[in-house]
């Protein structure tokens, strides 16, 4: 069965969520991957959204954290303050699942501005709860499409800290948890190198070359000694993803695949 690079990215990201994990989910690509995991490999994953739903099981992907679908399908809904103070800062979030406009080699995220902060070329959507998720979740996964504009050598602004300047930078900042443990793109999967915490390519998606990855990265990307090939999406995974996208498109008046 044929599939797109975006579908490969979403499936690869979904596989990273273990069954039973408590996951703080960002809107957009993270939500799509997390809900695909819930519908396939990890039916007991607990999805938490910033607006207060715990155990959300949306039949269509939410447009925002305030989408009623999240509250209506959740096991319970609590105040936002409880989500951050009790669940996140209390060490009860296993995985924070985040998107990004830009990321650097140490998994730091920019969702604020491109260019000078006071006179930016582009004003991005902003932080939301991402800085707190990146700082306090036990682990963080990042999903975004790969290009030199998105994978940059130096961020104009660090919205959410990953591994800081590398090495023991995160520990020196006093941030709990492991920080980012994976960056999943439409070309490959990257993981932090032991010691330096610089992200290196550990798995390449089928049909993708090293040259493509190098060309799509704004720094001198390195490859692990043992680089795997990502397992292609199964028919079950693709069917679940496409059904989810079709339901979402019908509900929101979109074209399937835009969801």
Residue ranges and their predicted role:
Residues 4-5, 79, 118, 255-259:
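Alpha-helix capping and helix-coil boundary motifs
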Residues 61-229, 233:
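Conserved phosphate- and dinucleotide-binding cores of soluble alpha/beta proteins
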Residues 17, 21, 37, 41, ...:
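Structural signal for hydrophobic packing residues in well-ordered secondary-structure cores
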């Amino acid at each position: 069965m044929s599939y797109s690079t975006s579908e490969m990215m979403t499936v690869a990201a979904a596989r990273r969520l273990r069954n039973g994990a408590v996951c703080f989910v960002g809107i957009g690509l993270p939500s799509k991957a997390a809900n695909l995991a819930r519908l396939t490999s990890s039916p007991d994953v607990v999805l938490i959204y910033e607006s207060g739903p715990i155990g959300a099981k949306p039949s269509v992907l939410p447009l925002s954290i305030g989408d009623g679908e999240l509250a209506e399908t959740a096991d319970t809904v609590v105040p936002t303050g409880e989500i951050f103070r009790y669940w996140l800062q209390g060490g009860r979030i296993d995985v924070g699942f985040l998107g990004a406009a830009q990321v650097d080699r140490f998994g730091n995220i920019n969702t604020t501005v491109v260019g000078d902060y006071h006179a930016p070329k582009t004003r991005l959507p902003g932080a939301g709860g991402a800085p707190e998720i990146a700082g306090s979740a036990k682990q963080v996964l990042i999903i975004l499409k790969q290009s030199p504009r998105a994978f940059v050598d130096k961020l104009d602004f660090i919205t959410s800290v990953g591994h800081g300047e590398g090495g023991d930078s995160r520990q020196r900042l006093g941030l709990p948890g492991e920080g980012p443990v994976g960056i999943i793109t439409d070309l490959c999967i990257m993981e932090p190198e032991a010691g330096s915490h610089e992200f290196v390519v550990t798995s390449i998606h089928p049909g993708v070359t090293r040259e493509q990855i190098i060309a799509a990265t704004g720094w001198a990307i390195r490859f692990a000694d043992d680089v795997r090939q990502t397992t292609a999406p199964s028919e079950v995974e693709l069917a679940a993803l496409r059904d989810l996208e079709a339901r979402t498109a019908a509900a929101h008046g979109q074209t399937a695949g835009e969801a």
